[in-house]
Every structure is written in C-alpha cells, then in structure tokens.
C-alpha cells in the first residue's frame, strides 16, 4: 500500500473532513487531499503573524526589545495560554510576546503582538508570499462562536499555503532569495525556525513520532476542528513537511469519544505514516 493510499485510508475512516498536504523533503514527492481548500486556520495562523512581525523588525519599523505590559483587558475573550491567569502588570519584551504566542499559543501574547502590527498588514504579507487562501480577519475568535460557524467569521488558510510558508522559512536558513521573499534577515529567519522547534504542545504531528524527533510546528484548535502544521526532522535534517486540517468535527463521536480526540489522533496517524513510509 502506497503512502498516499495509507494517508487517504486514515482520512476515510473518520466521518469528519481531513485536508492535508505532505512534502517529502528527501525526494520532493507531494501528497495532498483538499490541500487548496480554504479552511479554518486556528492558531496555525500565528506562524505568518510571527513572520510579519519579524519583517517589520528587519525593516526597523518595530523594536523586538520594546517593553510590553500585560493589562487585564488583554485577558478578555482569551481561552489559551497562561498569561490570563497571571497578575496584570508583568512587563515582557515584544520578542517574548511572539515567543508566548508561538510556543504556548498564548492569546494574551497574540493580542500584544497584533497591537503592534495590524491584521491588514499580516494579511497583505501572506498575499505577497502567494498564500492565496489565507485571510486574516480577526484578532481573536469570539468564545461564543458556534460550532457550525461560516468561514468568513474566522481567519482561514489552506494546507498548501502553510506548506509554502514553512518551506520558505526552511529555505531561508541558507537562501538569501528566500530571506528576501520573507523580508526578514538571516538572523530573524533562524530565530523563527528555532521558535517553531520550541513548541511545547506535543499532540498532533508529534504524538506518534519517536519522543526525540524534532518538529518545528504550530498547532491550532477551533470550533470546527483541530489542525497542525510543521517540519519534521530526522537525524537533525529536514525530513518532511506536513500540514493537516480537520473540519466538521462533531463534539462527540458515535462511540462517545470526544471529537477533538479523534481529530488529533488522525493527525498523529498521518504523521506516523509519513515517518515510516518515507524512510523505505
């Protein structure tokens, strides 16, 4: 059974929609399923926010060392991260706010960041990179958002758009052309990749890989599903890129299992097949 057949079989097992794109970085082989379909981004959107901030810093328009104060208002409508449980008045750098947004998906930190670059700027940045199906629409999705919300009520992306972004970040580790495309210095591109590697959350892509496997990724969750997008390494070298988006996931499956559990398990299985199949 081919890798592509195995990946599609995993998706076919579930009643919800799974869209993905994988790229074997050893051979260039690509496998996709609905990879160009616009889908809720969840927090995978934050990788492009990070890169837009780094571009602004490279251009001297913002200072990553500027102090940012945690104010109580920033915790309103926030359902992720740890800052919302902490005492207002804490001061961190903008760089640390970007780090918190990425490695813990802290939406207090996301608000801090998006008060220094605009959604319009981030959205335009994505379009300039060729991310045609990525649309940044809101700072933070409202907590009361319905599970069957329309696409236009959230930020959206596609599996292919996220592969494009991750590949460009990876290329920028050595390619001046990729650095220029991102609008970021070599140092900023190196920092971005390391920040993706510092991801704390280990479900999704990482869940069925060897514990020591290095993954540079950003996961996400939304009312309609779970998602994860990352670069998987083997023996310290880039191995494959995988971006996966589940959609129309029920709150509870027919057997009583929470829908998000099966969504994350599906992402883990897809990653595991790539890890095993691309090695043979």
Each language-model region and where it sits:
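Structured C-terminal helix/loop/strand segments within mature extracytoplasmic catalytic/sensor domains
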Residues: 2-8, 30, 169-202, 218-280
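Active-site SXXK
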Residues: 40-68, 242
């Amino acid at each position: 059974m081919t890798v592509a057949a195995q990946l599609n079989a995993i998706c076919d097992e579930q009643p919800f929609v799974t869209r993905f794109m994988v790229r074997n970085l050893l051979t260039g082989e690509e496998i996709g399923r609905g990879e160009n379909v616009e889908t809720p981004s969840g927090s995978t959107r934050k990788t492009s926010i990070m890169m837009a901030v780094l571009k602004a810093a490279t251009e001297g328009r913002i200072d990553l060392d500027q102090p940012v104060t945690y104010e109580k208002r920033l915790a309103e409508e926030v359902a992720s991260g740890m800052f919302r449980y902490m005492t207002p008045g804490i001061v961190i750098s903008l760089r640390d706010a970007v780090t918190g947004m990425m490695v813990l998906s802290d939406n207090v930190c996301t608000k801090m960041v998006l008060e220094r670059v605009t959604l319009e700027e981030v959205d335009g940045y994505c379009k300039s990179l060729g991310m045609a199906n990525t649309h940044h629409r809101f700072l933070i999705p409202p907590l009361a958002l319905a599970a069957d919300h329309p696409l236009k009520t959230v930020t959206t992306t596609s599996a292919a758009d996220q592969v494009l972004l991750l590949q460009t970040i990876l290329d920028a580790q050595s390619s001046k052309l990729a650095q220029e495309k991102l609008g970021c210095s070599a140092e900023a591109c190196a920092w971005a990749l390391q920040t993706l590697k510092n991801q704390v959350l280990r479900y999704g892509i990482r869940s069925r890989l060897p514990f020591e496997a290095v993954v540079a990724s950003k996961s996400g969750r939304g009312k309609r599903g779970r998602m994860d997008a990352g670069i998987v390494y083997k023996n310290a070298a880039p191995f494959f890129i995988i971006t996966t988006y589940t959609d129309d996931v029920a709150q509870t499956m027919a057997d009583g299992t929470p829908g998000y559990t099966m969504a994350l398990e599906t992402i883990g299985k897809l990653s595991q097949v790539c890890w095993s199949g691309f090695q043979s």
